[in-house]
């Protein structure tokens, strides 16, 4: 009997609640995902749905409230700070804003060298300098920028610094937290192509967080759709775009600009109503109050996250009926 491949990273019923004045804000609520080695899982959803919190909780930059985070089969939620230090080099993050996420007082080489020095992997300055030069070359930063400062560079080069810093300790898993959203469109494609080239060359595994559906389609093997802290649909990238099953996913995809105005009117799915409060939400589908297809099964209990076709999961009791329309 063939053994099932152990994913590089897996979350099981992961939760992150923040204490607020009136209760608990459910930022990440019972999310179970898996990412195989060398693959990219895209995470999409509107602002405030919990995308960035999910990524940072997986890295334990934010401590989870409940659930498991398995990295190469080991639950890192049970690791002490000392034990986590060994995993930090294997799990890195590229932040959204390439300027605010780097120290403006440090030069390019000093920024990239910082994690190398902290890790203690290289002892001599010559070894560290050689590693920095290698990383700069890998991400397409000219050697003449070695002693430059962030304010002297454009957004694309600053983000390349962020990529080089994330790669400094040879990680296996990288959270890309909207790494191109703050960049000009002309630069976005360059950074996306760089990330994909690095994945091919180094065997990297990505959790790619974005609100741009055209970007996530370009880079992801699988896509998970989040709404108010919950994963409501997950499928291979092509399958999700060709056959979305959840009404919220359909609405998101209908918002993608198309050049044909007649096609735009045919595919429009307008979401009406107010977003449900994420503070101690009642059981049931959190999209139901805005959904034109809501039924009695949508209230009273959270919809089951079901596999409706191979690899295609959806949390909607109406999914089969909507699929045949």
Regions found by a protein language model. Give the residues of each.
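Charged, flexible cofactor/metal-binding loops and thiol motifs
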Residues: 3-6, 24, 237-325
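Conserved ABC ATPase signature
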Residues: 149-153, 157
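Conserved ABC ATPase "signature" region
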Residues: 75, 126-144, 253-254
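P-loop NTP-binding/switch modules centered on Walker-like glycine-rich loops
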Residues: 46, 175, 179-183, 187-264
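Conserved ABC transporter NBD signature motif
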Residues: 67-75
